[in-house]
Structure formats: C-alpha cells, structure tokens
Amino acid sequence: MIRYLMCILLLLSVVISGCGKTDKITETAAETQNYTVHDIRGKKITFAKKPERIASSFVYADEILLDLVDHQKIVGLSKWVHDPGLSMGHKQAEDVPGIVENNLESVIALKPDLFFIADTAKKEYIDSLEDAGIKVYVFKYISRLDEIPDLVKGIGEAVGEKEKAETLIKTMNIKINAVKTKVAAIPQKQRKTGMLFLRFGAIGGAGCIYNDILSTAGIEDCYQQARPA
C-alpha cells in the first residue's frame, strides 16, 4: 500500500521515472546480535539475533518487510499484499505463500519469532499473542504521508536492518522532493482540482494520507466539497 500511494503521487505529478520495485538493497554480511527495540507502546523487545520467522498482519508493514529482509525469513503476510489493486508489492510477495488471517490460531500456526501488528488491534488480541510466546511489535497505524519514514525506521530496527531502512527512507524522500520541485514550477492558475477513487469509492479530506498525496502533487483535494450535504 505504501508503494501504491507513492506511485499515485508520482503519477499525479507526471514524474516519469520509477515507482515500481525498489532497487534491491545489497545484503550486509554481518548479522546484528543482541539488540533491543521499543515499539509504539514503549514495550522493550530484545533479540539475541535477527528474527528468522517474521509475520505481519498489515499491508503497510508487509511491503516494507518485502524490501528489508530475505523472503525466506517471512513466514506470513496479510492477504491484502497479494491484491494488485491495493499493493504494488503483490509480485514480490508471490514467494511468500503464508497468509496471516485475522485470528489468533492463524498467527500461532506460523510460529513466528516476530510479529508486526498495527496499534488498531485490540489489546486482548495482542496480549494473547504474547502469552503464546510470540514477540509482538506494535506499530502506529499511519494516516499521514510524513509518518511513513518512522514506520520504515521502526520496522527496520526491529528486524535488524537499520541501514536498509535508512536507504529506503532516503529513496522515498528523493522521490517526494522531485515531486515538490516539479510542482513548484507549475503556476497556481494551472493547478488542478481532483479527488482519489479506490474501488470502494472516493477517499480524501483534511488530515488524511490521500489528501497529503494530492497536496504534495499540487492538486487541490475536492473530496469535502463533493460529499453530499
């Protein structure tokens, strides 16, 4: 979904160069050992080595993991990452057959040594996963464009791939800055008004990541004006 949103942004601004697959990042030889991270809850999670059975229940995290870790280390992703209408990572995910369903049994069956889940999940569900001995990294559900780098950074630190995460963030910022430069050259009178449609309908409005995308691309979001009174 993140790359899908970035692709929308680049297309809207008529940036021709790449929004497809992120260039493969070279594997580092050294394995990070004995490291500790904190998730959005402030919970401390300690690793003796990089996790080798990683699972995720949310498409944002799915796509980031596909770019950060060897796919053989991913035992399960959400079903949404396999949907070409929602995820630019669906082809990358073809070699990850495991599907994380929205139930405790599905996750436990995958035997992950690290599980990513958004903070929109019920506390009782997260507690049950941890009671089953699973390390759970809870991340903030992102709703704004400028929240993406923190998500990438946090996931990168959790899987022991901090440098790769920094490279992804740098690549994203380069693309966004290229969009802003292009938009800055467009006279105000030539700016467009528009609205984003996904297959389930129109989406947008102030405080929404889709509104951020349109604004960054120099397009006025008319979602609020178009909504029925």
Protein language model regions, located:
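Extracytoplasmic substrate-binding proteins
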Residues: 34, 124-202, 223-225
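A short, structured surface patch at a secondary-structure boundary
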Residues: 53-119, 219-222
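Alpha-helical, coiled-coil/dimerization segments enriched in small aliphatic residues
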Residues: 81-85, 205-229
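Bacterial N-terminal signal peptides
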Residues: 7-15
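Positively charged n-region of N-terminal signal peptides that target proteins for export
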Residues: 1-5
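Bacterial Sec-exported substrate-binding components of ABC uptake systems
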Residues: 18-62, 163-194
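Solvent-exposed loop/turn segments at secondary-structure junctions
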Residues: 60-64, 80-83, 114-115, 120-124, ...
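Short hydrophobic/charged patches on amphipathic alpha-helices used for structural packing
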Residues: 104-108, 126, 211
